[in-house]
């Protein structure tokens, strides 16, 4: 057996290397040797602390050579720290870290390295047991390298939005994971990624801090400056995120001791002398801190609630004679999702502690019940099957009496059960310039509609007033109609159903035209538009919405007014203006899909109204009210329901016959008066899709039960990753579980995109696999 190099010999070697390179030894490295010698003399584990942020370029070569010697020395472990700005660039720091990889124990890296560094680390892996990373400039986490010894992973205070398809796939021993104060918000992709961790026991996206409200000095005491410092030690001044506290409050069992309920696991560590990383890696600091704070509260030395934490993020529960107040701190956005805690407990059966609250059997029972009542595991209540099994059953016709529609639903469920992240891709024509006389011109969509009969076509209108018919399967432009000269944004589009080559386009300046796309140009051009093949109607000032009836005889227009105009398509004339139909302007007007006389209007006056052209226009059939202004309304494909979307995620389904509430989808609001929500149907009447302009999430819910099937997070490119939001969306009328989303960016320099979403395919699907199951509806389907 080879003799291990002693620490004193290593130190001498380092000094000699420095002399060879003509530099003075680094004092931080000499201190590390001294500390290691002290530990050795006390018969403690010989651990060296290496502070890379104190290493300068002159120190680099001697240290790199020394690290190669450490692997064969009596040093038992290396704890590597970068706590402040590091002078070493990525391509210097990475070889240094890898040179001691065999003995790495703890790696703590903070705000120092770029994307290339992290991509290399996460792809190649490390042999450390603890990895603590902060201020990392990566939005999509994709740790696929071998981290076979990793026990604790701390990712707090990073701008992580989501996870790659194979993230966490090589971490067999990971037991503790913390992702507080990140941007993670998606329950579905997060749970799918975390399921790849077979040993995960403790997880946190937030910290529940307990303090007592039983102090006699609740309202009268004024804390000293030292007390304020103590508070800030445990609760940072960041504004808290509204957490799913009611789930937590309901599951707190007052019969249990406090210690069994509040598991004070803190991942901010202080490495112990013994190698007990397999029990708890340095949790003493946080545990003692919370106990100390609780004792101060009970003795009246602290106010019962810190001033920088909103009471919305607290709940109180009695334990005997003591009332404990729990405060959410450092919460990631995922914590504000409704039933977040119950969803995670149900999805991660091996988890023992979530957000430092212990999970008991009663919690799991409640989680199963909550999940069943509020979520769909697979569409159409199907059980998980393989695609091969479903296809075999269809070929054998083993299930008597089953229709083709039943097999199709089973196949959809089987396909949706496979990918964690659905296939998303932007229509390709937006990724490059359209060659025009003006070389800087690009088509920027503002509204779009699927063709009623041709599954490959959609029309979109641009910010500059152009109308473009696109083959969205090939990405090629089929027809192009330039702006009529005013360059006013197209806000209203509607295909005719009986005459499917005709499309109505309405502009923000009030212009209304009917185009025959067969007579339009097949190439993009800036030449003046020929009026042949188009019909011009009387203008409707500040137009926002147009829609034709089921017989293609009439269409309606609404805008920033209280009025609605009725037009005769065949004659090209305006028949009537219905005045003062609402108290505020009318956002959307929609005809019924089957009746040529019924139509609905939605307004910011909080009302949705149903009208009948055969009756007096001053009196609606009924009025249904929301608590906020209505952004839009649409009929279900069979006209049984009205889907009303109000500001900030208030989505309700009404019975068309009398306006009674059928379902409230109970989507969590963002508490924003500018969060305009839009919702449409998908898969006929089966599901609804909903998105809002302040969020990058599309929610998919069952239209019959209101249960959430899943959320889809939009992903921008590069720095825009988390800056996309939903401007409009439509379910694909020909493909089950497919949709398109008009997604805009917060930055004015970035153009909008039309993003196609396929819930049945994963993001690494081939082109052949990405096509959805087609279900050709009747031509009467509108909206």
Curated annotation (Swiss-Prot):
InterPro entries the record matches: DHU1, DHU1_N, LRR_dom_sf, U2A'_phosphoprotein32A_C, WD40/YVTN_repeat-like_dom_sf, WD40_repeat_dom_sf, WD40_rpt
Disruption phenotype: Hypersensitivity to ultraviolet-B (UV-B) illumination leading to short hypocotyls under UV-B; the sensitivity to UV-B is alleviated by the disruption of UVR8 and requires the presence of COP1 and HY5. The double mutants dhu1-1 cop1-6 and dhu1-1 hy5-215 phenotypes resemble that of single mutants cop1-6 and hy5-215, respectively. The UV-B responsiveness of the double mutant dhu1-1 rup1-1 is similar to that of the single mutants dhu1-1 and rup1-1.
Keyword Nucleus: yes
Keywords, ordered alphabetically: Nucleus, Repeat, WD repeat
Induction: Accumulates in response to ultraviolet-B (UV-B) illumination.
Primary site of residence: nucleus
One GO CC annotation: nucleus
Any one biological process term the GO annotation gives: response to UV-B
Protein location: Nucleus
Matching Gene3D superfamilies: Ribonuclease Inhibitor, YVTN repeat-like/Quinoprotein amine dehydrogenase
Motif (Nuclear localization signal): 382-389
Pfam family, one: DHU1_N
Renumbered ranges of WD repeats: 145-198, 212-256, 439-480, 485-525, 538-577, 581-621, 625-664, 666-710
Cited function: May act as a substrate receptor of a CUL4-RING E3 ubiquitin-protein ligase (CRL4) complex involved in the negative regulation of cellular responses to ultraviolet-B (UV-B) illumination, likely in coordination with RUP1. Interacts with COP1 and probably prevents the formation of active UVR8-COP1 complex, thus avoiding UVR8-COP1-mediated positive regulation of UV-B responses.
Record text on subunit structure and interactions: Interacts directly with DDB1A. Binds to COP1 and RUP1.
Protein name: Protein DWD HYPERSENSITIVE TO UV-B 1
